Swiss-Prot record:
Single Gene Ontology BP annotation: adipose tissue development
Family as reported in the entry's similarity comment: Belongs to the IFRD family.
A GO cellular-component term linked to this record: cytoplasm
Biased composition (Low complexity): 22-31
SUPFAM superfamilies hit by this protein: ARM repeat
Description of how the protein assembles with itself and partners: Interacts with PSIP1/LEDGF.
Region (Disordered), start-end ranges: 1-42
Induction field: By mitogens such as TPA in 373 cells and by nerve growth factor in PC12 pheochromocytoma cells.
Protein name (Swiss-Prot/TrEMBL): Interferon-related developmental regulator 1
Bias-annotated ranges (Gly residues): 12-21
Top-level taxonomic group: Eukaryota
Function field: Could play a role in regulating gene activity in the proliferative and/or differentiative pathways induced by NGF. May be an autocrine factor that attenuates or amplifies the initial ligand-induced signal.
Any one GO MF annotation of this record: RNA polymerase II-specific DNA-binding transcription factor binding
Length: 449
């Protein structure tokens, strides 16, 4: 068909400008006609998002961060956005609910909003409960993450205990559900461990949670013993999260319970060091170092029977040169197991320094390192801000009350981009000179002869 004879082509020139012509041109200009069912879930979510576009973008919290919120937005604007996100957790569309949960998680991770969360904790808990029960994998992961940052915001107390009593059984059910998504189970394991660390007040419930995690990661024991049993990588990821959550909760257990767990797992955990997954090997090594630290804290003359075989295995991992493994994995593994070997043999820990604002925190033990790594995994880039202002985290890491600084002082402490560039350039030159002295110079011999 010739181009000038195309069907539904708009007329050139000024035809009779009636309403039907305008409607026809608008329909044809927009592409093929799409039949839309009245009052469908898709239309409802689009309409809701259009009305709530001012506060429904979860990425704005991740991009702006706490500094921009302080400078450009007021507390009322932030609370208005959060109220809109809370309302969107009840939307019919799963994508809208997930986006709202992610926005809440980003906002609560990057800002301390104790009063706001305290007033709306029941509404938030109901929304999280509904999303955990009826949502799919991604929505469950987002809901579990919001539950953990909700407890971090409130800290230990009656309010967090009520949240844990409501959401704890649901999280535990998802973790133990073999038909659920591995990713959802993994996230729920980490977040459930954090919530229990903060809010648990019943010692029997703490022991029950430990047993729940043990039932999961001990399946890797069986896998290592029985060569006929094969476990897929996603299952190993769940076992890693359960092991790390179990180790975190072990740090707050009474001494008698810690001794029982040490007797039960001390001689089985080394079997995980031969796992094919590098992250499992690292998690097992760091957990062993932490267990040694706890055991020696209870008994200074603690004796481990299989010390020779364990140190031999740790030394092999600290100097691993297996060609069948990726260079990045080998480099990461060697770095971790050098520290683990030093902790087991010499009772030494390489102190790390964490800077946040004008303050510094020294991580000088495996217990402190594991606790810091866990909360950093949950809070992400908001960890530094929470270390400055969150009273609960400051109590956990023994930082004292928050240091109060006004906006002018904080602004003067900031380094400009140009100054950072000069500092990085100078550091790069100094590092290059220092390394050049250690490099082999034999290749240059005879070049100018």
């Amino acid at each position: 068909m010739p181009k000038n004879k195309k069907r539904n082509a708009p007329h050139r020139g000024g035809g009779g400008g009636g309403g039907s012509g305008a409607a026809t041109s608008a329909a044809t200009a927009g592409g093929p006609h799409r039949t839309v069912q009245p009052f469908s879930d898709e239309d409802a979510s689009i309409e809701t998002m259009s009305h709530c576009s001012g506060y429904s973008d979860p990425s704005s919290f991740a991009e702006d961060g706490p500094e921009v919120l302080d400078e450009e937005g007021t507390q009322e604007d932030l609370e208005y956005k959060l109220k809109g996100l809370i309302d969107l957790t009840l939307d019919k569309s799963a994508k809208t609910r997930q986006a709202a949960l992610e926005g809440l998680k980003n906002a609560l991770s990057s800002k301390v909003l104790y009063e706001f969360v305290l007033e709306r904790r029941m509404t938030l808990t109901d929304s999280i409960e509904r999303c955990l029960k009826k949502g799919k994998s991604d929505e469950q992961r987002a809901a579990a993450a919001v539950a953990s940052v909700l407890c971090i915001q409130l800290g230990p107390g009656f309010e967090s205990e009520e949240i844990l009593k409501t959401l704890g059984p649901i999280l535990k059910k998802i973790i133990c559900d073999g038909a659920a998504s591995i990713q959802a189970r993994q996230t729920c394991a980490t977040c459930f461990g954090v919530c229990c660390f903060i809010a648990t007040d019943d010692i029997t419930e703490l022991y029950s949670t430990l047993e729940c995690f043990e039932n999961i990661f001990t399946k890797s024991y069986l896998k290592e013993k029985d060569t006929n049993v094969t476990c897929s990588t996603p299952n190993t990821v769940l076992h890693i999260s359960s092991l790390l959550a179990w180790t975190l909760l072990l740090t707050i257990c009474p001494i008698n319970e810690v001794k029982k767990k040490l007797e039960l797992h001390f001689h089985k955990l080394p079997s995980l060091l031969s796992c094919d997954d590098v992250n499992m090997r690292i998690a097992a090594g760091e957990s062993l170092a932490l267990l040694f630290e706890l055991a020696r804290g209870m008994e200074s003359d603690f004796f481990y029977e299989d010390m020779d075989s364990l140190t031999q295995m740790l030394r092999a991992l600290a100097t691993d040169g297996n060609k069948h493994r990726a260079k990045v994995d080998k480099r990461k593994q060697r770095s971790v197991f050098r520290d683990v070997l030093r902790a087991v043999e010499e009772r030494d820990f390489p102190t790390e320094t964490v800077k946040f604002g004008p303050e510094r925190m020294y991580i000088d033990s495996w217990v402190k390192k594991h606790t810091y790594d866990t909360f950093k995994e949950v809070l992400g880039s908001g960890m530094q801000y929470h270390l400055q202002t969150n009273e609960f985290l400051r109590n956990v890491f023994e930082l004292g009350p928050p240091v109060m600084l006004d906006a002018a002082t904080l602004k003067t402490m900031k380094i400009s981009r140009f100054e950072r560039h000069l500092y990085n350039s100078a550091a790069f030159k100094a590092r290059t000179k220092a390394r050049s002295k250690c490099r082999d110079k034999r290749a240059d011999v005879g070049e100018f002869l």
